[in-house]
Amino acid sequence: MDLNNFMFFINLFHRFYFLFFPVYNGLESGYSHFHADYYEYYEFYIYYLFFAGFTFFTFLSKGVIHMKLICSKSNLLNGVNIVSKAVPSKTTMSILECILIDATKGQITLTANDMELGIETVIEGEIIEKGIIALDAKIFQEMVRKLPDNDVTIETDASYKTIITCEKATFNIIGKSGEDFSYLPQIERSDSILISQFTLKEVIRQTIFSIADNFTNKILTGELFEINDNVLKVVSSDGLRISLRKIELKNSYSDKKVIVPGKTLNEISKILSGDADEDVNIFFTDKHILFEFDNTTVVSRLIEGEYLKIDNILSADYETKVKVNKREFLSCIDRSTLLVKEGDKKPIILDIQDDIMELKMNSIVGSLDEEIDIAKNGKDLMIGFDPKFLIDALKVIDDEEIEIKLLNPKAPCFIKDEQESYIYLILPVTFSTVA
């Protein structure tokens, strides 16, 4: 409450007192001494007092600023963009469509929560009046995005009316009570690992593409995070391919195994800075996983169940080993997809003979036949694959030269490095011989 409002209220009370004081004195002295002038206006005084009092308390409630804060547009927009990734696209609970602004604890905290994934981040700014408000995420995000690049002032009152001001632009919107918002669950910060933001971002990038994109098998919509002998193993699969990354951890950690939703990892990868000098703390419980980095906290429910047992699959024998330049191989496969119409699943055929691998594609659009040099050990082989699956794996491999291991036309191929820090398993597809 500012000084002008305070003085207005004092003056109003002052007037009420001197208006009612004569009536009160007259009543104290008994009706026999009650002055006729006072009695004539007594009923009017009572109604007036009731109306003025009601108006006063209504004004007191709605006119007082319940929250006021100032922060730069860039800080605010960055925070809103981070937490908005946890706002559900569809929900029956309107409060979950909001971003919570909490300025009650000496810092400005933004939170969004869809009950499966919750994100909280702290932004820099000045708190003039402490308070809390929930604002529609889509509207608020667009408002902030389109404001001038200057300081933004956010004010609210008891009726949740929110005024957002920046330079000469002023938005008025109605928010919701922050008391109804679902806060992030309290997670015990005891069982954890520490890795760099760069490493986590890379691990997600190199595995996320092969998770299942439907809920026929919910477990496959997530990724396995397994720690064993201080090695973090991350696995994803959609049933037709498997992606695996191994990371040696610097410190000693207890063994653990959890399934993290792909949506959670996808959103985290967009937030991480990718800085090798900045770390991420990852905390594990039976039901949740928590990622803590910079000024941001991400909490996600885990997927319950048993993940695929892949150890026996990945240790399969091979009869043909090929070493090939990754960039040349990828470019050739990419060219072949020009002949495939959307929705038409045509395989690319690898005809491996001596030191040459011939790539063939045949469709109603046309055909492709291209040779690339390889180093081969073992038998000649002809095998077909979905070109998209090969492209997805090759795009995330940073090595200049890759190694492909194959057994027969019906067995999966393995793309891996010598240390097996990454392994990509891809099932072959049937094909007819290209003329």
Where are these regions (language model features)?
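Structural preference for solvent-exposed beta-strand-turn elements
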Residues: F20, Y24, Y38-A435
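Hydrophobic, low-acid, alpha-helix-prone terminal segments
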Residues: F9-L12
